[in-house]
Every structure is written in structure tokens, then in C-alpha cells.
């Protein structure tokens, strides 16, 4: 598996973007560019260990902790002690793990995974959804891009990702298939997740937190899966709902995702921005 260079753009406040399970940094391309174009953020979006283009995991099994270990090393190489961390799905789980280690200035979970305890039925429901997708995953490994020629392939590929089949472009769909076909983390992480709890220390989150819910999320539907975050995060955590989008909203609504991130980061950084640009007397 070839390792690719992470997305690294812009200058200003450090922002780390973490992608979902089975996918790669490519899901953040549009949002990363939009954040960098504000002129206020230095954006870093790596592909996590065991995923297409990421470093080898170095272990038989994967967990959010192991993934966070790899990301921490990358932050150290950048010279970033802390960053504003934004994660989607699995990336959201890893974002909270990094916050627990003191690496976050703020944390945003977009349709974040990990909102369960060890024996929560919702945990096994999510794992079951990924296991149910195993035949499609095996087809992508056998056929590669030819998978997209099969009947209903677009519908099946986009069902867990977007609010509608048209929410993902042909180029994005091709990248999704490539990512899924080259992701050893699939088995490594699912097996380990069966044995581990999710995010149990949300109440101790010590930085500003932002929960982004996706109305048409079919992987972690917000009506049932958001409660763990809204109940256990400290009072004052911001909650944003993106209407009409699925589990990976960066595909169908990158501008709205960027807007939600920037609005929250502006709230987090206002004092320092006022210090840099004091009002005219």
C-alpha cells in the first residue's frame, strides 16, 4: 500500500482533520481548501494508519488509541503541541481520544463514532452495518473500479455516505472504491471494536466541544446515536444539525461543513483574534 503525503495547506490557527473509517484524507479536500482560503487556518489532513495511503498500522488489531498514537507522532513532526481537531465518524472518535491526551484546543465531532459503552446495543448495531457491507467490500477488492459498472452500484455505495445517491460525484465515488479496496483496517478495527468500549470520558472534556449531527445519517442516526454525546459532554457543548445530509457530509455539502467549523472556531479563538486586531480607539 503506497503512502501518500497528507493534505497540508494555509497558515494560522492549526486545524487537524480526521477522516471516517474505510476512507482517506481525500474526503476533506474541498473543506481543507476552503478553510485554508480564509487565510486564518493552517490545515493538516492525514490518512490514518491502516487506511488507503496511510502508514502501516504496525499491529495485528487496530483501535482508536492506536490510530491516535500515529496521529500524535505526525503532530510532533509538525511541531504542533495542540490543534483544533475535527473528525468525521471514526475520525471523531480519534479526535476525542486526542483531546483526552491534551492535544486539542477544541474538538468537533461530525457524525462521530464511539458514542456507546462496551455492551451498548447501538455499538453492535453499527458494527453489524459494516459487517453487512462485507460482500460489497470484497467485490471492490476483486473488481476495483469495475464494481461501479454493476447494477445499483451507485445506490449501494452512497447509501451509508450521503443523503441521496446524487450527493457524491463520479470522481468522489471512484476514490471511495479505491479507498475501500485498499483498507486493511476493516478487519483489524472491527474485531477490536467488538471487545472495547467507546468514549467513556466525555464528561472530562476540557476544551470547547462541538457536536455536528447529520439529519439523514444512516450509519449513526442522530435521534438514537447523539444522546451519548449530548448527555455526557460538559454543559455548553455546541450542537449543530446539518439538514438533508448523510454520514459523510463533506461530499454533498462541503460549504456547509466549512461554515459550521469556522463558526465554531471563531467562537473559540475570538479573544486571540481581538488581541491581534484591537479595535480602533
Feature roles, as predicted:
Residues 3, 9, 42-90, 120, ...:
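Active-site loop/oxyanion-hole signature of alpha/beta-hydrolase fold enzymes
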Residues 203-245:
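Conserved loop-alpha-helix segment in the C-terminal half of the alpha/beta-hydrolase fold
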Residues 7-55:
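Conserved HGGG/HGGXW glycine-rich cap/lid loop of the alpha/beta-hydrolase fold
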Residues 92-102, 107:
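Short glycine-enriched nucleophile-adjacent loop
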Residues 143-203:
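Conserved alpha/beta-hydrolase catalytic His-Asp/Glu region
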Residues 19-21, 83, 87-89, 214:
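Conserved alpha/beta-hydrolase "nucleophile elbow" surrounding the catalytic nucleophile
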Residues 245-258:
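Catalytic histidine-centered segment of alpha/beta-hydrolase-like enzymes
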Amino acid at each position: 500500500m503506497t503512502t501518500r503525503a497528507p493534505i497540508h495547506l494555509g497558515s494560522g490557527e492549526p486545524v487537524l482533520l480526521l477522516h471516517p473509517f474505510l476512507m482517506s484524507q481525500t474526503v476533506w479536500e474541498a473543506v481543507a481548501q476552503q478553510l485554508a482560503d480564509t487565510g486564518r487556518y493552517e490545515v493538516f489532513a492525514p490518512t490514518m494508519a491502516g487506511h488507503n495511503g496511510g502508514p502501516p498500522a504496525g499491529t495485528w488489531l487496530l483501535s482508536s488509541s492506536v490510530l491516535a498514537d500515529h496521529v500524535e507522532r505526525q503532530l510532533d513532526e509538525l511541531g504542533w503541541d495542540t490543534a483544533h481537531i475535527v473528525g468525521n465518524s471514526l475520525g471523531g472518535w480519534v479526535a476525542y481520544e486526542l483531546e483526552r491526551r491534551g492535544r486539542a484546543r477544541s474538538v468537533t465531532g461530525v457524525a462521530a463514532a464511539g458514542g456507546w459503552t462496551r455492551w451498548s446495543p447501538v455499538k453492535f448495531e453499527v458494527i453489524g452495518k459494516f459487517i453487512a457491507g462485507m460482500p460489497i467490500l470484497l467485490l471492490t477488492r476483486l473488481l476495483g473500479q469495475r464494481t461501479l459498472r454493476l447494477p445499483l452500484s451507485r445506490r449501494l455505495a452512497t447509501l451509508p455516505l450521503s443523503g441521496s445517491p446524487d450527493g457524491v460525484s463520479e470522481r468522489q465515488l471512484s476514490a471511495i472504491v479505491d479507498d475501500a479496496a485498499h483498507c486493511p483496517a476493516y478487519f483489524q478495527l472491527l474485531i477490536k471494536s467488538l471487545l472495547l468500549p467507546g468514549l467513556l470520558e466525555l464528561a472530562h472534556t476540557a476544551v470547547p466541544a462541538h457536536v455536528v449531527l447529520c439529519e439523514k445519517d444512516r450509519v449513526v442516526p442522530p435521534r438514537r446515536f447523539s444522546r451519548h454525546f449530548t448527555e455526557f459532554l460538559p454543559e455548553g457543548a455546541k450542537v449543530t444539525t446539518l439538514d438533508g445530509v448523510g454520514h459523510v457530509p463533506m461530499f454533498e455539502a462541503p460549504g456547509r461543513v466549512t461554515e459550521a467549523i469556522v463558526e465554531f472556531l471563531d467562537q473559540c479563538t475570538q479573544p486571540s483574534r481581538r488581541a491581534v486586531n484591537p479595535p480602533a480607539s
